[in-house]
């Protein structure tokens, strides 16, 4: 779950910026409307990553198929850069605490979304850019799954991930989903 929130934001940005063929390399290149979807802790994390650390992330991500767990990924980062490992571990713990605070239904939904997002993000970092259809399908799947959650699960997500909830409820997002997925 180390990159969980980043991944969720990245999936959202990828899915809803469909006409843009490249994902921004730098935080400053992310369009303002998508920056507002990124939680403050994640924004600070993204801004703090140096170009050298980005290169390390890309290098480590190339082996994403070999990682059985987040701990495997973190250990690989630690071998390459203790500083990057420390940054990643902090973010990982923030997200893990938020996920663990969710009720069971919400936790299952978020974990599934994180797993999908992690896979797509790792593929992207490894140079295997997912197709637009894959991104569209992933976005649609998660939005529909969110709509199918009980009100208690939605409330639980809203408490821990208010920006994510805003994303799922945002009328502009819904319109964009309809435009790109239909």
From Swiss-Prot:
Q: Which UniProt keywords apply?
A: Coiled coil, Lipid-binding, Secreted, Signal
Q: What is its main location?
A: secreted
Give an example GO cellular component term for this record.
Answer: extracellular region
Q: Which residues form a coiled coil?
A: 86-106
Sample GO molecular function, one term = lipid binding
In terms of superkingdom, the source organism counts as Eukaryota
Where can this protein be found? Secreted
Signal peptide position in this chain? 1-17
Q: Which family does it belong to?
A: Belongs to the fatty-acid and retinol-binding protein (FARBP) family.
PANTHER family, per database record: FATTY-ACID AND RETINOL-BINDING PROTEIN 1 (PTHR31418:SF7)
What does this protein's UniProt record list under function? Answer: Probably binds lipids.
Query: What is the designated name of this protein?
Result: Fatty-acid and retinol-binding protein 1
Q: Name the gene for this chain.
A: far-1
């Amino acid at each position: 779950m180390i990159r969980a929130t980043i991944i969720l934001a990245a999936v959202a940005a990828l899915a809803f910026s469909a006409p843009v063929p490249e994902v921004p390399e730098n935080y400053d290149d992310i369009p303002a409307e998508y920056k507002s979807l990124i939680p403050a802790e994640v924004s600070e994390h993204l801004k703090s990553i140096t170009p050298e650390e980005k290169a390390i992330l890309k290098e480590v991500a190339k082996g994403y198929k070999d990682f059985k767990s987040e701990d495997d990924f973190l250990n690989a980062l630690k071998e390459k850069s203790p500083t990057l490992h420390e940054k990643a571990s902090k973010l990982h713990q923030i997200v893990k605490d938020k996920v663990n605070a969710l009720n069971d239904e919400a936790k299952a939904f978020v974990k599934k979304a994180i797993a999908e997002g992690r896979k797509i993000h790792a593929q992207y970092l490894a140079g295997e850019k997912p197709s637009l259809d894959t991104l569209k399908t992933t976005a649609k799947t998660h939005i529909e799954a969110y709509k199918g959650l009980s009100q208690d699960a939605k409330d639980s997500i809203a408490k821990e991930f208010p920006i994510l909830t805003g994303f799922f409820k945002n009328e502009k997002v819904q319109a964009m989903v309809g435009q790109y997925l239909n």
